[in-house]
Amino acid sequence: MRVIFSGGGTGGHIYPIMALIERLKERKLVTNDEILFVGTDRGLESKIVPAAGVPFKTLKIKGFDRKHPLKNFETIELFIKATKEAKQIIKNFKPDVVVGTGGYVSGAIVYEAAKMHVPTIIHESNSVVGLANKFLAHYVDKICYTFDDAAKQFSEKKKLVKTGNPRSQQVLGLNKENIDIAKKWDLNPNMPTVLIFGGSRGALAINQIVEKSLSELETKPYQVIWATGQLYYGDVKKKLAGKEVNSNIKIVPYIDNMPGLLPQMTCVVARSGATSLAEFTALGVPVILIPSPNVTHNHQMKNALDMEKAGAALVIAENDLNPNNFVSSIDHILLDTNYAKKMSEASKKLGVPDASDQVISVMESLIKNK
């Protein structure tokens, strides 16, 4: 099987592809020479993909500027040029199937593949369908999705296949070596513990609310692992210099083995990006979600509300955050074991433990019938 993958800009477009590639290799359906990732040289993919040793090519492309419409003439020019380059990439690589996960770069490569009658799939991991996937839906053979709300936004109902997010299956496979929290941070593995984090870089609003709530959290009969993000760690340590933080609170810059920590957490406080939610639901971890307001179409809030509706999360809008609702939400989960158990069960129902295999089945079916 020869496959071109394309997605760019954010982790939500990249990690599902990386999970699929890993599973394809595990099942010996591809060699490294039979896959190609097409992205941009500016997005997160330009670091993640080459670092994983995956063959990588770039197209120069950018998104539409909603505030300055006149700048979009350049965007259209770049898109036309990118489709010509995409055509050449497809001709040279000769893929059996092309899979896009969103981002403008996937628009060019998947659109061109569809025109060339190469089997095509898009995968939508959010509740709100992105512009690239909305555009591509008319041309592709199959549309894989995670959230039911996303399915409602596609008019091409016959193309829809609910597969879940491939990251779900990957994170279950990675869940082999748990972090020894007693050894690493001198914490009690039998005590309720909450992990608070805002992604690898961190989230200022989440860090600020933890700072404001710290004195109250220190009095609680549970433990707190506060991952500030690499960007904010120095500032947080500086602000707390000279203050003796209680031993039930551990402040770290980043968690480098999230799948090894999540199964041990009673609760997690986090943003609601698609990749994070795939991890939480795969493992059935109760969550308090503080959606980022700085994302297109406010899709993190929609993702979070879908989780809350299913009973798998509590949601606090960033603008509504205060020490009272923040700490009481954590208390509600950590101090009520029945409630935490119900949330965990609801979360697991949303997870798709074989999501990668489901997407691969769609790929194989298209190749077989082409």
Curated annotation (Swiss-Prot):
Q: What Pfam families does this protein map onto?
A: Glyco_tran_28_C, Glyco_transf_28
Q: From the Swiss-Prot or TrEMBL record, what is one GO molecular function term? A: undecaprenyldiphospho-muramoylpentapeptide beta-N-acetylglucosaminyltransferase activity
**Could you tell me what reaction this enzyme catalyses?**
Mur2Ac(oyl-L-Ala-gamma-D-Glu-L-Lys-D-Ala-D-Ala)-di-trans,octa-cis-undecaprenyl diphosphate + UDP-N-acetyl-alpha-D-glucosamine = beta-D-GlcNAc-(1->4)-Mur2Ac(oyl-L-Ala-gamma-D-Glu-L-Lys-D-Ala-D-Ala)-di-trans,octa-cis-undecaprenyl diphosphate + UDP + H(+)
GO CC aspect terms: plasma membrane
- Give GO terms for biological process: carbohydrate metabolic process; cell division; cell wall organization; lipid glycosylation; peptidoglycan biosynthetic process; regulation of cell shape
> Where is it predominantly found?
membrane
UniProt pathway annotation: Cell wall biogenesis; peptidoglycan biosynthesis
Establish whether keyword Cytoplasm is in the entry: no
Name the residues that bind UDP-N-acetyl-alpha-D-glucosamine.
Answer: T10, G11, G12, N126, S200, I255, Q300
User: Domain of life here?
Assistant: Bacteria
What keyword terms does UniProt attach to this protein? Cell cycle, Cell division, Cell membrane, Cell shape, Cell wall biogenesis/degradation, Glycosyltransferase, Membrane, Peptidoglycan synthesis, Transferase
Output the CDD domains linked to this UniProt entry.
GT28_MurG (cd03785)
Enzyme Commission number(s) from the entry: 2.4.1.227
Nucleotide-binding as UniProt keyword: no
Q: Subcellular location, in the record's words?
A: Cell membrane
Mode of membrane association: Peripheral membrane protein
Q: Which HAMAP family match?
A: MurG
The record's comment on protein family reads: Belongs to the glycosyltransferase 28 family. MurG subfamily.
Per the entry, what this protein does is: Cell wall formation. Catalyzes the transfer of a GlcNAc subunit on undecaprenyl-pyrophosphoryl-MurNAc-pentapeptide (lipid intermediate I) to form undecaprenyl-pyrophosphoryl-MurNAc-(pentapeptide)GlcNAc (lipid intermediate II).
This chain belongs to the protein called UDP-N-acetylglucosamine--N-acetylmuramyl-(pentapeptide) pyrophosphoryl-undecaprenol N-acetylglucosamine transferase
Look up and give the organism this protein is from. Lactobacillus johnsonii (strain CNCM I-12250 / La1 / NCC 533)
Task: State the taxonomy lineage.
Answer: Bacteria, Bacillati, Bacillota, Bacilli, Lactobacillales
